[in-house]
Swiss-Prot record:
It holds the Pfam family ARD. This is Acireductone dioxygenase. Belongs to the acireductone dioxygenase (ARD) family. Catalyzes 2 different reactions between oxygen and the acireductone 1,2-dihydroxy-3-keto-5-methylthiopentene (DHK-MTPene) depending upon the metal bound in the active site. Fe-containing acireductone dioxygenase (Fe-ARD) produces formate and 2-keto-4-methylthiobutyrate (KMTB), the alpha-ketoacid precursor of methionine in the methionine recycle pathway. Ni-containing acireductone dioxygenase (Ni-ARD) produces methylthiopropionate, carbon monoxide and formate, and does not lie on the methionine recycle pathway. One of its GO terms (molecular function) is acireductone dioxygenase [iron(II)-requiring] activity. The keyword Oxidoreductase applies. Its cofactor is Fe(2+); Ni(2+). GO terms for cellular component: cytoplasm; nucleus. PANTHER family: ACIREDUCTONE DIOXYGENASE. The lineage of its organism: Eukaryota, Fungi, Dikarya, Ascomycota, Pezizomycotina.
Amino acid sequence: MKAYWYDNIPGDQRLPHDSGRTVDASYLATIGVLYRHCPAISAVDDLARDRGYKNRDEIIISPEKMGDVYEDKVRMFFNEHLHEDEEIRYIVDGEGFFDVRSKDDEWVRIRLGKGDLIVLPAGIYHRFTTDENNYVKAMRLFQDEPKWTPLNRAPELDANQHRKTYVESHISSSTA
């Protein structure tokens, strides 16, 4: 895992966009993002048991696996959105980037590779993309039935209860 401030330079979203300013895991924790390196699946199983994740599946994001819909899917994943549930991803193979909003609404880019696990809290604005190799195999973990429902960022979404709870827990409490 490598986290840093996104450079905001226009261009291919799959490039690193590394500003050279690093972000450490302790900052990620303050915005509710949990990171773990899990070299063995047993560590993922332990975390799943401890956090009550009952279901899982795997997804391969690549042109070979997804065919003609690959580019559209990657663009869709890169639209800024939130979920009303935690988003848990364990990288089985390949690499990708999660971008998450900071306390000041700036992008923090998190590069994940094989063995990296990330938990994004419900209500955090984020987006995802593969890197320039266009391949990632990820395990998705779920507390209940598998679902992935993105709510794209819009002004009215700030009234969403999951967003409000996130802001109260991770943004407002740290600036008071």
